[in-house]
């Protein structure tokens, strides 16, 4: 009887942990925006620091809301960056996504003193995204490195 109770408890605990991980993975983590600050270089330098904002892995998909992108843009602009660097994975699957004009409009709102730079992510190649990724990033004011 004790073994059965322990087994039931273990199964219930395992189920709750699994459900919690799935909930976190699909409902919390994709919408987190984290800002980390790093100071690099000589501390005694008299040069003004350069502020670089890096954005990555937005993974736009059919249930992606523009509120999320707007939050990212607002947060980045509040940091007053000298450069914005987008390091890929704009799309989750481009073939399932079609509202490029709204996306371009939002990305254009990113401001950087010296420019915006983008590189390709592994997800930016499939589903017809190669052609569109380059077009969208360039129309949004990014210099796409090849």
Regions found by a protein language model. Name each.
Residues 1-46:
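N-terminal membrane-anchoring alpha-helices
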Residues 48-143:
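Membrane-embedded segments
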Residues 146:
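Short loop/edge segments at beta-strand edges and connector loops
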């Amino acid at each position: 009887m004790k073994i059965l109770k322990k087994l039931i408890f273990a199964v219930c605990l395992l189920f709750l942990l699994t459900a919690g991980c799935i909930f976190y993975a699909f409902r919390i983590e994709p919408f987190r925006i984290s800002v980390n600050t790093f100071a690099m270089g000589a501390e005694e330098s008299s040069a003004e620091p350069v502020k670089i904002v890096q954005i990555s892995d937005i993974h736009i998909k059919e249930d992606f809301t523009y509120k999320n992108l707007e939050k990212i843009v607002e947060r980045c602009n509040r940091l007053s960056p000298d450069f914005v660097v987008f390091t890929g994975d704009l799309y989750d699957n481009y073939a399932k996504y079609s509202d490029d004009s709204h996306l371009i409009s939002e990305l254009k709102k990113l401001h950087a003193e010296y420019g915006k730079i983008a590189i390709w992510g592994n997800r930016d190649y499939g589903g017809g995204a190669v052609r569109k990724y380059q077009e969208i990033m360039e129309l949004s004011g990014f210099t796409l490195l090849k």
